[in-house]
Structures are given as structure tokens and as C-alpha cells.
């Protein structure tokens, strides 16, 4: 018994020294630490994804709470008398020139507009008001679509005109965007005829005055 105990005590330092190298079982502590690190990383990723989902849901809820209204309806218009030509006036006072579009496609005239305004009630809340219209008109056969002109008056009236100009049946009509000219005073055909008549009368009066002085 004394010998066996002495033998075990004599081998104990050697076994302690060579134990990590001569052990029949691999050391499991590093594997456990790697698994713990991986689990912590997965938990952090899961927490980040949950936070992103909450933020996304909060953003969607805030967007849903912002009131907005979209109105799509035609604007009022009238056909002006211009002999055998084409004259059209649309009430577009709620739209700026940049928000209007006039497009000529063949013998079709497509007029559209879209505006968006932010309305604030003064108490920290606001809403958006969107207004849009799309209207289409047919050009007369005696009107050349390439001569269509468009102008916007200071009162918000959009004037579209085209003089009489016959086309041959074989001539193709191209597609184009009609530019909108902004003017402070747009003269209608009736106004032009009256103005020309008044100018002629004034010139006649001046000529009569000069002849009397001679």
C-alpha cells in the first residue's frame, strides 16, 4: 500500500504536466466558448432586426396618419368663336405653368395638369391636397395641328388657338408638345378685331386733322 501510494504520488507531477497533451479526450473549453460567442452574435442580430421592424412599423403608422386628398376632375372650358379656326379656353387658375401640359397627338389635343399643395392648420398638423385633370379635344379638319399655340393669362385662363389652314389628306400629322407661353394679357380673336378697328378709326381721325390744318 505504501508503495502504491508512493508510486501514484511520484507520477502525479508528470501526469499534471503532460495531461493536456496525453489526454485521450479533446479539450472542450474552446469549443464551448465559440458556441457561446456565436449564440450572443445571433441574439444581437435578432435584436437589431426586431428594432428595425418596430421603426419601420412606426414610420408606416406616421404616414398613415398624414391626411391627404386626391381630386381628379376636369376643369371648365369653353370654345371661343374664331371663324373656322380653333379657339379653346380652360380655367386653370389652380395650376402654375410648370404644372400644365399640352400635347398634340395627331388630330387630338391632350391637356393635363397636376398640382400638390401642403396645407398647415397652424397647430402642428398638416395635410396634402392633390388636384389633377386630364382632358382630350378633337381638332377640326380645317386646322393644321402644327399651328396650335397655347398661352396662359394672368387670370389663370389657358388659351389654345389655331387658325384655319387646310391640309392635304396624305400629309401625316406629327406628335409634339405645345409650349405654354405666359403673358399678362392674352387677346382673344374678338378683342383683336375690335382693337384693329379702333386703331383704324384713330388713324383716320389723325389724317383728317392733318388735312384740315393744311
Swiss-Prot record:
Positions of the UniProt region annotated as Disordered: 193-214
This protein's UniProt keywords: Stress response
MF terms in GO: unfolded protein binding
Domain sHSP: 66-183
Alphabetized PROSITE patterns for the sequence: SHSP
Biased amino acid composition, Basic and acidic residues: 202-214
GO cellular component: cytoplasm; nucleus
Keyword Lipid biosynthesis: no
A Pfam cross-reference name: HSP20
Gene3D superfamilies: 2.60.40.790
Keyword hit for Lipid biosynthesis: no
GO biological process, one term: response to heat
Family: Belongs to the small heat shock protein (HSP20) family.
UniProt protein name: Heat shock protein 30
Gene: hsp30
Amino acid at each position: 500500500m505504501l508503495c502504491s501510494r508512493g508510486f501514484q504520488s511520484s507520477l502525479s507531477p508528470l501526469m499534471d504536466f503532460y495531461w493536456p497533451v496525453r489526454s485521450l479526450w479533446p479539450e472542450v473549453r474552446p469549443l464551448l466558448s465559440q458556441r457561446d460567442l456565436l449564440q450572443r452574435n445571433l441574439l444581437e442580430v435578432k435584436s437589431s432586426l426586431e428594432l428595425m421592424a418596430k421603426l419601420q412599423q412606426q414610420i408606416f403608422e406616421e404616414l398613415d396618419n398624414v391626411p391627404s386628398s386626391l381630386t381628379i376632375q376636369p376643369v371648365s372650358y369653353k370654345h371661343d368663336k374664331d371663324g373656322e379656326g380653333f379657339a379653346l379656353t380652360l380655367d386653370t387658375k389652380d395650376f402654375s405653368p410648370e404644372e400644365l401640359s399640352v400635347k398634340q397627338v395627331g388630330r387630338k389635343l391632350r391637356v393635363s395638369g397636376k398640382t400638390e399643395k401642403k396645407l398647415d392648420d397652424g397647430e402642428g398638423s398638416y395635410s396634402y391636397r392633390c388636384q389633377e385633370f386630364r382632358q382630350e379635344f378633337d381638332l377640326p379638319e380645317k386646322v393644321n395641328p402644327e399651328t396650335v399655340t397655347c398661352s396662359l393669362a394672368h387670370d389663370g385662363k389657358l388659351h389654345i388657338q389655331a387658325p384655319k389652314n387646310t391640309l392635304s389628306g396624305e400629309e401625316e400629322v406629327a406628335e409634339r408638345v405645345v409650349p405654354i407661353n405666359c403673358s399678362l394679357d392674352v387677346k382673344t380673336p374678338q378683342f383683336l378685331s375690335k382693337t384693329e378697328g379702333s386703331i383704324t378709326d384713330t388713324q383716320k381721325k389723325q389724317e383728317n386733322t392733318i388735312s384740315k390744318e393744311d
